């Protein structure tokens, strides 16, 4: 395949890579991330608000990228000494179900575990069955019900041990 040929399979060139600080992102890149979050969760954020997220630069700033465009984001913060909170985990809808979510989770979890993080929590739309299944296989369980958390949709607060790989459950 010619490196300059855009007709090649984008899947072959995607990988989860560390992201620079959002304060260094261009406005165009922020708008694309905002759109990705909106398309996958229904949440709409101001780009300035995104730049203010307290992301942990050591384990909580990842993008699924082909080197030119972002197709996914995984953003997390340190909640306390041993707990991380996932703030955003979105993958382009046409790439969902292809293993990129599991790869993104493992990338984040390995980096966080190496820094002493032992637990993780997040919020997820109650109707996002594939994501809930991914989290459940990694030991997270619903710990609270969030009414109206996502514009017209309820959510779950999920918590559990931080696992790099899925269990067989």
What are these model-predicted stretches?
Residues 89-97, 124-127:
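A short, internal acetyl-CoA/4′-phosphopantetheine-binding micro-motif in the GNAT/acyltransferase core
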């Amino acid at each position: 395949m010619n490196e300059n040929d855009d007709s090649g399979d984008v899947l072959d060139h995607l990988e989860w890579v560390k992201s620079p600080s959002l304060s260094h992102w261009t406005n165009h890149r922020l708008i694309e991330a905002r759109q990705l979050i909106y398309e996958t969760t229904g949440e709409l954020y101001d780009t300035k608000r995104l730049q203010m997220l307290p992301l942990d630069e050591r384990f909580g700033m990842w993008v699924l990228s082909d080197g030119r465009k972002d197709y996914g984001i995984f953003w997390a913060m340190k909640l306390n000494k041993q707990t991380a909170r996932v703030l955003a985990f979105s993958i382009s809808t046409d790439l969902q179900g292809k293993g990129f979510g599991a790869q993104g989770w493992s990338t984040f979890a390995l980096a966080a575990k190496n820094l002493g993080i032992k637990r993780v929590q997040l919020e997820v739309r109650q109707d996002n069955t594939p994501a809930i299944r991914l989290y459940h296989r990694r030991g997270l369980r619903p710990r609270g019900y969030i009414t109206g958390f996502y514009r017209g949709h309820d959510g779950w607060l999920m918590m559990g041990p931080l696992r790099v790989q899925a269990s067989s459950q």
